[in-house]
Amino acid sequence: MIKFALALTLCLAGASLSLAQHNPQWWGNRNTIVHLFEWKWSDIAEECETFLAPRGFAGVQVSPVNENIISAGRPWWERYQPISYKLTTRSGNEEEFADMVRRCNDVGIRIYVDVLLNHMSGDFDGVAVGTAGTEAEPSKKSFPGVPYSAQDFHPSCEITDWNDRFQVQQCELVGLKDLNQHSDYVRSKLIEFLDHLIELGVAGFRVDAAKHMAAEDLEYIYGSLSNLNIEHGFPHNARPFIFQEVIDHGHETVSREEYNGLGAVTEFRFSEEIGNAFRGNNALKWLQSWGTDWGFLSSEQALTFVDNHDNQRDMGSVLNYKSPRQYKMATAFHLAYPYGISRVMSSFAFDDHDTPPPQDAQENIISPEFDDDGACVNGWICEHRWRQIYAMVGFKNAVRDTQLSEWWDNGDNQISFCRGNKGFLAVNNNQYDLSQELNTCLPAGEYCDVISGSLIDGACTGKSVTVNEHGYGYIHIGSDDFDGVLALHVNAKV
């Protein structure tokens, strides 16, 4: 009986930890993360204070913080090839990182770090030098900045069969030296690295290449981490939010279900299917059952996105900033529909897969610059600063804890729905106008469409909709309108 009680206690403790690791630790009613891809720490700090907090964002996913290899031309993916766990990259040093985390936490914006636990850098001719000046010999699996040596890695092999669990989890992903996370020493170095970031005030981690590590090894590492730092406003005993990159299109040998008990999982099927729908390859009417009926993870386990820094560079169904009208419609639906833990992308312009972030002649990352409307102009795309996207972050905050109701569609690509009595969204992806009296579910009054304009000093700069005492309003979205979506909510009442 004593043994049974002990086993039950340990089981319940593990379950409690895993549930805690699904909690993003957001402030108040905020509930959207933005990935400020390749931004400098000083620029993120200022963005938290001047833009993200006032617009109601909840958190920022930042690029990898640890020292990385220096590759010719400085492609973005060099950040995913670690040399050491020193906090020096082209985004800044440890002091600048700590200052950014503190300043963002002070205004209610949580920081989530993209962490690389699976591997170190790939082969390099001779001695490689990292962004902190540390030398390493990747071909010999020698990384004195940690230190790691050959005994800390799995034997070298190539992934040739993605249906072979051994290859997927113990061979080298695109030639990157594969760490042995079952080693007590390797575990201790990874835990030390993550705990240092927790001490500096981060709220959690995006775990890169999680499916290439055994779930039981990650469970040990996550369970050994410190609680979040109460000096940064986290409650006592709060656990870091974990969201894990697991690409699973179905029927995979290593599946997302092995990881979703440990934390949230990136729901790549969401990204692919929302792209299919808004590219016109699947009628929007089918989105009424969006979520688990589509084979997605449960809402609290799914990190959802229209695109991410990887798949936006691939050809296929995934939408990106280069198809702005469809992208804004898809993002509006993403943030309006009650499913998933939402993340929006903030990109830089790219012409090919390897395009580096905007940089000067000395290969220093440059700060984003803004026009009079607040949009980025110097190589940064900054989708999160598009009115149609940040306004939907406000919409998502306004309708939090409400359910979907009053779904309407025309049997094709025109849809609308309510979020309780607090919000209404309509989308037209047909080649003809949507002109219809629809139930908005809102209290009577005049509302500003936050897609086409903003509510400023009590006046709407875009379209407005008058809602009658029965909750109905006349909705018009022309097929040639600049945006194919309209959104109303209680905080945008004129």
Curated annotation (Swiss-Prot):
It catalyses: Endohydrolysis of (1->4)-alpha-D-glucosidic linkages in polysaccharides containing three or more (1->4)-alpha-linked D-glucose units. One of its GO terms (cellular component) is extracellular region. The modification Pyrrolidone carboxylic acid is found at Q21. The record marks D310 as: Transition state stabilizer. Its EC number is 3.2.1.1. Gene3D superfamilies: Glycosidases, Golgi alpha-mannosidase II. The active site is at D208 (nucleophile), E245 (proton donor). One of its GO terms (molecular function) is alpha-amylase activity. Its cofactor is Ca(2+); chloride. Ca(2+) binds at N118, Q169, D178, H212. Pfam families: Alpha-amylase, Alpha-amylase_C. Binds 1 Ca(2+) ion per subunit. Binds 1 Cl(-) ion per subunit. Keywords: Calcium, Carbohydrate metabolism, Chloride, Disulfide bond, Glycosidase, Hydrolase, Metal-binding, Pyrrolidone carboxylic acid, Secreted, Signal. Residues 1-20 form the signal peptide. InterPro entries: A-amylase/branching_C, A-amylase_C, Alpha_amylase, Glyco_hydro_13_cat_dom, Glyco_hydro_b, Glycoside_hydrolase_SF. It is found in: Secreted. It comes from the Eukaryota. Monomer. Belongs to the glycosyl hydrolase 13 family. This is Alpha-amylase-related protein. It comes from Drosophila kikkawai (Fruit fly). The gene is Amyrel.
